[in-house]
């Protein structure tokens, strides 16, 4: 990272290299500080599952974390050296508690710049293959993290970083997502997310110690 090596001392870089070598490409669970570090230096690649029923309702999950609260399209970060199909299956189990039928091709690509970082999501259409193992709430019942609810239209209290899914659902309703996967973008939060390109460069690649 020419011109920015001074951001980390030689000792800190050596420590970081040692930590990365210990992970050994296993996609292991990352400690929170290391996960935050990853989010600060690269974009994460995710899968999102847009589950709809025969009536066109969409199934959303309640999220409540330091970056906001609201209903969101369930998704998951692809682990290192993990195939997309495996992550789609894991996401379905984790978020819905049941299997889902997932379309082979992504219906949209969604990039989000927020206070957490920068994510690029492959959004796939999906339908449930069973009864969700997570709690389904209806009416005015107060949701808790992980609860699911069917919506005929995107609710007013969408998770702040998922407001872009209003555009995705509207485009899907007009039949505009049947022939490809267009890009949808959202900028949200206090950080400067409007930069088109990062500063600096990446130094020559080298094997981990």
For the regions a protein language model found, what residue spans apply to each?
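Acidic, metal-coordinating catalytic segment for phosphate/diphosphate chemistry
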Residues: 2-48, 185-187
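Residue-level preference for beta-strand/loop junctions
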Residues: 43, 69, 118-120
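Conserved hydrophobic/aromatic beta-strand scaffold that supports enzyme active sites
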Residues: 50, 60, 123-125, 150
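Conserved Nudix-box catalytic region and its N-terminal flanking loop in Nudix hydrolases
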Residues: 53, 57-95
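Short loop segments at secondary-structure junctions
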Residues: 53-56, 64, 127-133, 153-155
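Active-site segment of metal-dependent pyrophosphate-handling enzymes
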Residues: 93, 97-134
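NUDIX/MutT-family hydrolases
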Residues: 125, 135-174, 185-207
């Amino acid at each position: 990272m020419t011109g920015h090596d001074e951001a980390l001392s030689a000792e800190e870089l050596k420590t970081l290299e040692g930590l990365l070598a210990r992970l050994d490409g296993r996609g292991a669970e990352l400690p929170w500080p290391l996960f935050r570090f990853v989010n600060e230096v690269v974009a994460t690649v995710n899968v999102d599952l847009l589950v709809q029923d025969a009536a066109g309702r969409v199934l959303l999950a309640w999220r409540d974390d330091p970056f906001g609260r609201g209903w969101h399209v369930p998704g998951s970060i692809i682990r290192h050296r993990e195939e997309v199909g495996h992550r789609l299956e894991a996401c379905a189990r984790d978020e819905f508690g049941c299997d889902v039928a997932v379309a082979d091709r992504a219906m949209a690509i969604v990039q989000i710049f927020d206070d957490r970082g920068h994510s690029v999501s492959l959004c796939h259409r999906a339908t449930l293959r069973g009864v969700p193992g997570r709690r389904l709430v209806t009416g005015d019942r107060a949701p808790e993290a992980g609860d699911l609810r069917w919506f005929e239209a995107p609710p007013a209290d969408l998770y702040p970083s998922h407001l872009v899914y209003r555009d995705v659902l509207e485009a899907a309703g007009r039949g505009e997502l049947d022939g490809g996967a267009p890009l949808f973008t959202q900028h949200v939060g206090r950080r400067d997310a409007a930069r088109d390109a990062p500063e600096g460069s990446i130094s020559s690649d080298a094997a981990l110690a």
